[in-house]
From Swiss-Prot:
It is a peripheral membrane protein. It comes from Arabidopsis thaliana. Plays a role in vesicular protein sorting. Component of the membrane-associated retromer complex which is essential in endosome-to-Golgi retrograde transport. Also involved in the efficient sorting of seed storage proteins. Binds alone to endosomal membranes and is required for recruitment of VPS26 and VPS29 to membrane. The VPS29-VPS26-VPS35 subcomplex may be involved in recycling of specific cargos from endosome to the plasma membrane. The lineage of its organism: Eukaryota, Viridiplantae, Streptophyta, Embryophyta, Tracheophyta. Pfam families: Vps35 (PF03635). This is Vacuolar protein sorting-associated protein 35A.
Length: 787
């Protein structure tokens, strides 16, 4: 078997093939002339080429296949000879006169095949003789190929049920005995290869054994194809005998391959009914055997079997498949003390997937698997093996993918304990997977207890207190994570206000301790969710039992104030400013004047102390004016105070055009059409006159700075405000004041040089003409204006 090099091996193969071809030619010539003696002579010489020890398994196989093809011709010739009167018994004896044992046994197997076909003797006797005689070849390579030839030519002549060779003297038991004996001897030869030659060639020998393994495995395939091998025979005879040989050979390569062969070639039904026998052998295998892969494939096959055949599911419970697999995995891990953490996690991951497929309604089984995994991981600390971490994520993702419902996963008490063994980065990944599952399946989390459990699972993306120093998180990834948390908040919902208030309190607890950089993402949706809760509160008097509500608007507004207070420190004062105004509007609808005033006060403080950018001030002031205009809860004193502050802010804006627009916007604060108490025409007119004054000042500044009269757009905007209030019937806005302003605009020298202002003015005049065409009071009022 030892080759000096690939070139020498090619030469030996070429020389052997040439001699083989020459003898095959003379053998064929003897066959053609019906010369049995010469046919035997040249066939023996031809087969002598298989006695070489210089070829690798791959090259030897080439030579073997040439011999196989020629032996098929010789077998046909033997059959014809028996028809011409040659005694098959004499032929069987004659082939044994060959000088060398290897050619003799090949010829004996060929003659034995003919002997069985003639049915002149029981098939079991001939098969037993052949399999015993083959023990004469103990060279591993030559012996394996010889027995492979025996298995090949005999597989269609086994006394199986329904076979023509079945009879009173020949039963399927004889066929099974023959195949098992041949398998046992072949496995011994195959294992012996591992221990021949120097230690430095171990890798080469293992490679060669890998090339030869199918020769051994074919015996198990033959067994699986026998009609007579039913469940009883498989359980009582085949499986115990095969496992006995596998365990006793004590060879890592053989044990791994043959166990896998059993799983792959025999029916799933047989595996299900013999689980205890098959699994009982696993702890007895060598510690180096990759039992993880073997058991994973077994569980995968059983899972697929259950998925394709729903009617077999009761049998899984009947044979206690889960318990047997779980116990077997525990024993294997216990037997292999040095088993890598990856292997253990993979085994439990496969078991969990098996459980979810076969027993989806048994959450206790799934939780038991997770508990076993926790027990195995205990004392290991954070897992630093990348592949093991990936497998752990796969294990944790399995319940989410199966149930499409995080609520179900939350019922698994050991689930969060497994999450604890993930490192910080992987916890973030797992948290994202959980949140995406919730959003994809529109899963509502309806109790504070479940929300608390959920946030324990996803704390990797809502809490940065335990992140290691120096851990840099990509900003885009961070924003994406926090946006997903913001979306998640809207999936935490309960129609009962009391339970919903408990939920938002849980959110508050986690968000306020989650680190300042996350607050600008999480506080706004929390505020919105809480404001929705306020709208669902029962109106006073709706409770017929007179029971005092534990959740009141006052409590909720206090809660809102507490969470918004955290934002200016982030810093996100503009965000806090907007939220205060939203809360003020909500308080207005609840008729809570003191609370609404307090929220406005907080907004004003932020405007004065935190918002310094001129553009931001303009936007903020527009929000103040718009919100204050819609407020109906304030009494005269509070409203005057807030309105006075707003007009003061407007007059202090940096840019004159901004001042002008803010001041004329304040005019809306003094005239609300639907509220007679807020209809102060004098102050409306005062705001508009002040706006005209500021617009005039802005034009002078433009003239001084740029040498031009500046845009007339501000005057046209003010004209539109005059028209609005004139149409609403404000007494102080007279026809004369409107006509005077129109005349002022027409006299502006800058109008022709500013197409946009010219177009704006033309559109305003067209609007006035359109209003004149209307019937009723509005048409009459506009008719009075002479353009």
């Amino acid at each position: 078997m030892i080759a000096d090099g690939s070139e020498d091996e090619e030469k030996w193969l070429a020389a052997g093939a040439a001699a083989f071809k020459q003898n095959a030619f003379y053998m064929q010539r003897a066959i053609d002339s019906n010369n049995l003696k010469d046919a035997l002579k040249y066939s023996a010489q031809m087969l002598s080429e298989l006695r070489t020890s210089k070829l690798s398994p791959h090259k030897y196989y080439d030579l073997y296949m040439r011999a196989f093809d020629e032996l098929r011709k010789l077998e046909i010739f033997f059959m014809e000879e028996t028809r011409r009167g040659c005694s098959v018994i004499e032929l069987y004896e004659l082939v044994q006169h060959a000088g060398n044992i290897l050619p003799r046994l090949y010829l004996l197997c060929t003659a034995g095949s003919v002997y069985i076909k003639t049915k002149e003797a029981p098939a079991k006797e001939i098969l037993k003789d052949l399999v015993e005689m083959c023990r004469g070849i103990q060279h591993p390579l030559r012996g394996l190929f010889l027995r492979s030839y025996l298995a090949q030519i005999s597989r269609d002549k086994l006394p199986d049920i329904g076979s023509e060779y079945e009879g009173d003297a020949d039963t399927v038991i004889d066929a099974v005995e023959f195949v098992l004996l041949n398998f046992t001897e072949m496995n011994k030869l195959w294992v012996r290869m591992q221990h021949q030659g120097p230690a430095r060639e171990k890798e080469r020998r293992e490679k060669e054994r890998g090339e030869l393994r199918d020769l051994v495995g074919k015996n198990l395939h033959v067994l699986s194809q026998l009609e007579g091998v039913d469940l009883d025979m498989y359980r009582d005879t085949v499986l115990p005998r095969v496992l006995e040989q596998i365990v006793n050979c004590r060879d890592e390569i053989a044990q791994y391959y043959l166990i896998d062969c059993i799983i792959q070639v025999f029916p799933d039904e047989y595996h299900l009914q013999t689980l205890d026998v098959l699994l009982g052998a696993c702890p007895q295998l060598q510690a180096s055997v990759d039992i993880m892969t073997v058991l994973s494939r077994l569980m995968e096959r059983l899972s697929n079997y259950a998925a394709l055949n729903a009617e077999v599911l009761p049998y899984f419970l009947q044979v206690e498949a889960f318990s047997k697999l779980n116990n077997a995995i525990g024993k294997v891990i216990e037997a292999q003390e040095d088993m890598p953490i990856l292997s253990a996690v993979t085994l439990y991951s496969s078991l969990l997937k098996f459980t979810l497929h076969v027993h989806p309604d048994r959450l206790d089984y799934a939780d038991q698997v997770l508990g076993s995994c926790v027990k195995q991981l205990s004392g290991k600390g954070k897992i630093d093996d990348t592949r093991a971490t990936k497998e752990l994520v796969s294990l944790l993702s399995a319940p989410l993918e199966k149930y499409n419902d995080v609520v179900t996963a939350l019922k698994l008490t050991n689930y969060p304990l497994v999450v604890e063994y993930l490192d910080t980065e992987t916890k973030r990944i797992m948290a994202t997977v959980i949140v995406r599952s919730i959003m994809k399946n529109n899963t509502l989390i309806t109790t504070a207890e479940k929300v608390e459990a959920l946030f324990e699972l996803i704390k990797g993306i809502i809490n940065d207190l335990d992140e290691p120093q120096g851990l840099e998180v990509d900003e885009d990834d961070f924003q994406e994570e926090q946006n997903s948390v913001a979306l998640l908040i809207h999936m935490l919902y309960n129609d009962d206000p009391e339970e919903m208030f408990k939920i938002v309190n849980v959110l508050k607890k986690h968000f306020l301790t989650g680190g300042p950089k996350r607050l600008k993402f999480t506080i706004p949706p929390l505020v919105v969710s809480t404001l929705k809760l306020i709208r669902r509160l029962p109106v006073e008097g709706d409770n017929p039992f007179g029971k005092e509500a534990s959740v009141t608007a006052t409590k909720i507004f206090q809660f809102l104030n507490q969470i918004i207070e955290a934002l200016p420190n982030v810093p996100s004062p503009d965000l806090a400013f907007r939220l205060y105004l939203q809360c003020a509007e909500a308080a207005d609808k609840c008729d809570e004047e003191p609370i609404a005033y307090e929220f406005f006060t907080q907004a004003y403080i932020l405007y004065e102390e935190e918002i310094s950018d001129s553009k931001a001030q303009v936007t903020a002031l527009q929000l103040i004016i718009g919100t204050l205009q819609r407020m109906q809860v304030f009494g005269v004193e509070n409203r005057d105070t807030l309105t006075h502050k707003a007009t003061g802010y407007a007059a202090k804006l940096l840019k004159k055009p901004d001042q002008c627009r803010a001041v004329y916007a304040c005019s809306h604060l003094f005239w609300l059409e639907d509220r007679e108490t807020i209809q102060d025409g004098e102050r409306v007119l005062l705001c508009l006159k002040r706006a005209l004054k500021i617009a005039n000042s802005a034009q002078q500044v433009a003239n001084t700075a740029r040498g031009s009269t500046g845009s007339v757009t501000l005057f046209i905007e003010i004209l539109n405000k005059y028209l609005y209030f004139y149409e609403k019937g404000v007494p102080q806005i007279t026809v004369e004041s409107v006509e005077s302003l129109i005349k002022l605009i027409k006299n502006e020298e800058s109008m022709p040089s500013d197409p946009s202002a010219e177009s704006f003015f033309a559109t305003t005049l067209e609007f006035m003409e359109f209003q004149k065409q209307k019937e009723g009071a509005i048409g009459e009022r506009y008719q009075a204006i002479k353009v």
